[in-house]
Structure formats: C-alpha cells, structure tokens
Amino acid sequence: MTLEELNRTSPFHAGAENTAFAPYFDGTSYLNMLSTEQVPVGCVTFAPGCRNHWHIHRAARGGGQILLVTAGRGWYQEWGEAP
C-alpha cells in the first residue's frame, strides 16, 4: 500500500516524515500526532523495510506505551518473559 492509498483509506494517516526520532529507526517512518493533550497519542507508520531499535518505554504510572498495530507484523518483548 502506498502512502497515498493509506492516507485515502485509513483513519490513521501517515503524517509527516518522522525526522525528530530518525536516530531510533533504520529506514523511514512517519508520525501523525493524534492528540497532544492529557495523553499524547501518536500514529507511527513504517515505510517498507523500516524498523526501530529495541528500546523500553518507562512511565511513573500507568503504561509506558500502548501499541495498536493496524497492519503488518512485528516483534515485542514483555518484561520478565523469555524472548
């Protein structure tokens, strides 16, 4: 699916090229901030072949990050569980 098709058919538009966080990705990603108010919500779109580096999201309370995958496949690691 092209970016144009994604932006036309999905409620989760790709947004602008994610240059601010580019050091954490191999390849091109796009960021569309859906909310910046009380709970920041961002939609990150990975171009074909893009991946991000293993990392952790910590939070003082609640969850550090919640992932909602809309297409494709990926890997994640749960704390305390075998990879």
Feature-to-residue mapping (PLM):
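Intrinsically disordered, low-complexity regions
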Residues: 16, 28, 43, 63-64, ...
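Conserved hydrophobic/aromatic positions in well-ordered beta-strands
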Residues: 32, 42-44, 67
